[in-house]
Amino acid sequence: MAELTALESLIEMGFPRGRAEKALALTGNQGIEAAMDWLMEHEDDPDVDEPLETPLSHVLGREPTPSEQVGPEGSGSAAGESRPILTEEERQEQTKRMLELVAQKQREREEREEREALEREKQRRRQGQELSVARQKLQEDEMRRAAEERRREKAEELAARQRVREKIERDKAERAKKYGGSVGSRSSPPATDPGPVPSSPSQEPPTKREYDQCRIQVRLPDGTSLTQTFRAREQLAAVRLYVELHRGEEPGQDQDPVQLLSGFPRRAFSEADMERPLQELGLVPSAVLIVAKKCPS
């Protein structure tokens, strides 16, 4: 049975003549399968239908060489030698084979593209998972650093409070050593109320007595009281610090600032008063103070 040439087969399958000739020429006339592979790979190229450059043998006034006169099939047949004419049945059979080959090539191409798309999707998911893991690790590192920073700040705060307590204890020990006796006990004996009361306004006031110490009783909001002996020249801030450290709250618990009041005459001591000596504030030789929670400014 006579067969169609490669060019005729491609045209029979529906490819444009110019595109078929271009495919055969660019594949070196290696057969219909090579030409079909080229056509499928380049069917979307914008210049797929542009003609090839004119061969030298087609230049005006140039005679083709004997090798250029050979047909694209490379059969070497002499010019004018005719090929057998195909019957309609043979043409249909050959066209059917070519269409099956085209369908096979198309399936192979689709399968290849599907595999490539699947691989791209796997790569995208893999990159997404890696990005999610990296983001989660970054968040965990930030949370861990924040927790460590909070622990460090808490430890520094507790250490600062401990240093203040130790300073108070050292001051108490120094006062006890200097003046003798126990200082800082809540059950300290009450100081004797000094001086006689004048019987009449016209009576001469007694000579004012100088005191080196003063006894301060502090009444807390919960009904308990603290008693402490201070030097007369100590500032009122020492009394407030003593109250803040001994008012019975748990160590490390946030404590509200306190304000000191005198019962009679009624007086609220200001921040400026905290820098004044107890003697100057009239709290010597003894006084009773009331603790009130200070509203934050």
UniProtKB/Swiss-Prot annotation:
UniProt-recorded Gene Ontology molecular function terms: ATPase binding; K48-linked polyubiquitin modification-dependent protein binding; K6-linked polyubiquitin modification-dependent protein binding; proteasome regulatory particle binding; ubiquitin binding; ubiquitin protein ligase binding
InterPro entries: UBA, UBA-like_sf, UBA_UBXN1, Ubiquitin-like_domsf, UBX_dom
Gene Ontology CC: cytosol; nucleoplasm; VCP-NPL4-UFD1 AAA ATPase complex
Span of domain UBX: 209-291
Composition bias, Acidic residues: 42-52
Region described as Disordered: 38-214
Pfam families: UBA_7, UBX
Name of the protein this chain belongs to: UBX domain-containing protein 1
